[in-house]
Amino acid sequence: MDVNPTLLFLKVPVQNAISTTFPYTGDPPYSHGTGTGYTMDTVNRTHQYSEKGKWTTNTETGAPQLNPIDGPLPEDNEPSGYAQTDCVLEAMAFLEESHPGIFENSCLETMEIVQQTRVDKLTQGRQTYDWTLNRNQPAATALANTIEIFRSNGLTANESGRLIDFLKDVMESMDKEEMEITTHFQRKRRVRDNMTKKMVTQRTIGKKKQRLNKKSYLIRALTLNTMTKDAERGKLKRRAIATPGMQIRGFVYFVETLARGICEKLEQSGLPVGGNEKKAKLANVVRKMMTNSQDTELSFTITGDNTKWNENQNPRMFLAMITYITRNQPEWFRNVLSIAPIMFSNKMARLGKGYMFESKSMKLRTQIPAEMLANIDLKYFNELTKKKIEKIRPLLIDGTASLSPGMMMGMFNMLSTVLGVSILNLGQKRYTKTTYWWDGLQSSDDFALIVNAPNHEGIQAGVDRFYRTCKLVGINMSKKKSYINRTGTFEFTSFFYRYGFVANFSMELPSFGVSGINESADMSIGVTVIKNNMINNDLGPATAQMALQLFIKDYRYTYRCHRGDSQIQTRRSFELKKLWEQTRSKAGLLVSDGGPNLYNIRNLHIPEVCLKWELMDEDYQGRLCNPLNPFVSHKEIESVNNTVVMPAHGPAKSMEYDAVATTHSWIPKRNRSILNTSQRGILEDEQMYQKCCNLFEKFFPSSSYRRPVGISSMVEAMVSRARIDARIDFESGRIKKEEFAEIMKICSTIEELRRQK
């Protein structure tokens, strides 16, 4: 019989059907090739939004800069970046009036954090622009290179290990007449391969010293490298994102720490919380507006969209905000916080790799690096690119473009949220002084606006006033892309609200399945995802049970570990059948060893090894949990591991899962091809750095919280700690006299070697 699909929904409240509208199957689009074009778009657009501003020239770098602040008031609905300083300051003052003490308290909290933060805070984060090599590197390597070069140029405040002292070095480095750096270069030679007798290109990497004069150094210190944002769904065009260098990062971190403290205290802010906490916070605002709208009042909600949020924000405005927020604070603190916006007012955008040309007829390819765009003949380019290059040329210096206005993506999310909330805050009746009033939610550039008024005209007037107020601080609400509805139905940061936030389970679909780390981690992650969705996303018991069965099936196909008694033939089945036959307690075999699945929705929180431990044969236990098993290169095992899960929409989320170490927790070996490239030295540095840090963490297990202070080097700290620990262990009888003597001898040897060095 045919089933009429609409019957399925008869008993379902409409909001629960949202999961059936899931549009994102398949892989998201990734970018290939160069991001130069996208970066030029960003630079040109940003200048266009501020074109009526004043042009000046930076005296140090010679870069032309456009300042739109206090520019003309808008006369049309086009997006613009002409924020008015006095309006921003007034919005801040009203925000403080509504939340007495909010700035003062946040400053005190931040001051404490500033004095305690260690420089290794900057090792967090992925790709970072490394100014010494003029390209991207992992954050830890970029920091190590920066510190190494600072020290060789006589900047040593950073040796205390405090971030604030490293920032002192950054400030001093900008005053130096020149900086000497070590940079890598490649030599390419064509040689004949002995084995294949073909000609191959051999690369060797060399290091050379180079002197940067003040101007060149400043340009590098103020540079943001750009890349193309990957995996963005629902867009036809890619866009550029920026990664700043180590000089900027520390200052940005402190500004964002202050802004985060403020956001935490603002009920309209969707940052820095997430998940259920965020939903609860936001539901409160909606509830307030709905209860306060008396029976006679109308209440409407705008699902808002801002045009080019980042490109219309201005670092000079952020400087004004910080100056106001910190106005009663000590001078040193105000200075530290004002440096980030000042650097951003003078920032340079690196144009990336440049363009690749190829001639089909002659089978030739050639790269035109960004540095050449300033003076290359434009006849080689198509019309569109020609226009871009012509427009950007006056701004170019050494392959970077001067970009004073605009903020680049994702740099000051917290601080720009504070600005947005300050406008929402002005919607209180005591400020609007009329019959309409508004409130709302703000999370970086995303907002929802709730307007209450006695009639439709009032609602319209309220929206208009909000729109115009935003314009005064450089926020451009897009009338085309914003959508108004009766309060009770709206969307905010991919949360859909209909009489409460609706669980949109389909958004989590991409994270179901086998991750492909190893058999042990994949099993654990798979069941944890299902468990988390039962807790957070209304995944019901029947659906969860089905998801679990599908996951186990998927897992068995991925690792070819069908049950020992199944008829499916794979290249592992011979071994698994043998194991199955010689195992007494078959229920104890892990799924990855051809065992049965004992998971159901009640025991998803228990790691599989623990679930089956009592059921295992003794010799199987011994093989499974054997740290000396020669076939497994083991990770250090923590009780909890972290993985990244990708929802369909929005940022990748970090997720914890239980990690029980078994011989299935293998790590694939690193691909060899990297070892033959210029990256090799960097890889070795990074591994050495990693090893040292791991060793250090072993000696000071809580070292992520309290590091030893005032001891001159890591090695000495570890040696002295080893001696203390050994003495305690010896006196309490945990180690024998011989072992104690051996430890002491090793410690002395290490110290001796250090002295000789």
Swiss-Prot record:
- Which GO molecular function terms does the record list? nucleotide binding; RNA binding; RNA-directed RNA polymerase activity
Task: Give the residue ranges of motif Nuclear localization signal.
Answer: 187-195, 203-216
Consult the record and explain the modifications the protein receives after translation: Phosphorylated by host PRKCA.
- Top-rank lineage group of the source organism: Viruses
Principal subcellular localization: host cell
The protein's matches in InterPro entries, at most eight in alphabetical order, are given as:
RNA-dir_pol_NSvirus (IPR007099), RNA_pol_PB1_influenza (IPR001407)
Which Gene Ontology terms describe the biological processes this protein takes part in? DNA-templated transcription; symbiont-mediated suppression of host gene expression; symbiont-mediated suppression of host mRNA transcription via inhibition of RNA polymerase II activity; viral RNA genome replication; viral transcription
UniProt keyword annotations, A-Z = Eukaryotic host gene expression shutoff by virus, Eukaryotic host transcription shutoff by virus, Host cytoplasm, Host gene expression shutoff by virus, Host nucleus, Host-virus interaction, Inhibition of host RNA polymerase II by virus, Nucleotide-binding, Nucleotidyltransferase, Phosphoprotein, RNA-directed RNA polymerase, Transferase, Viral RNA replication, Viral transcription
Question: Which stretches make up the RdRp catalytic domain?
Answer: 286-483
Query: Quick one: where's region Disordered?
Result: 52-82
User: What reaction gets catalysed by this protein?
Assistant: RNA(n) + a ribonucleoside 5'-triphosphate = RNA(n+1) + diphosphate
Bias regions of kind Polar residues — which residues? 55-64
Cysteine pairings via disulfide bonds: none
Q: Where is this region: Promoter-binding site?
A: 249-256
| Signal peptide span | none
Question: Where in the cell is the protein located?
Answer: Host nucleus; Host cytoplasm
Enzyme class (EC, first level): transferase
Q: What is its EC number?
A: 2.7.7.48
Question: Which GO CC terms are listed, alphabetically?
Answer: host cell cytoplasm; host cell nucleus
Is Nucleotidyltransferase tagged as a keyword? yes
Q: Could you tell me what this protein does?
A: RNA-dependent RNA polymerase which is responsible for replication and transcription of virus RNA segments. The transcription of viral mRNAs occurs by a unique mechanism called cap-snatching. 5' methylated caps of cellular mRNAs are cleaved after 10-13 nucleotides by PA. In turn, these short capped RNAs are used as primers by PB1 for transcription of viral mRNAs. During virus replication, PB1 initiates RNA synthesis and copy vRNA into complementary RNA (cRNA) which in turn serves as a template for the production of more vRNAs.
Matching entries from HAMAP family are given as: INFV_RDRP
Sequence similarity: Belongs to the influenza viruses polymerase PB1 family.
Q: Assembly state and interactors?
A: Influenza RNA polymerase is composed of three subunits: PB1, PB2 and PA. Interacts (via N-terminus) with PA (via C-terminus). Interacts (via C-terminus) with PB2 (via N-terminus); this interaction is essential for transcription initiation.
User: Would you tell me the protein name for this molecule?
Assistant: RNA-directed RNA polymerase catalytic subunit
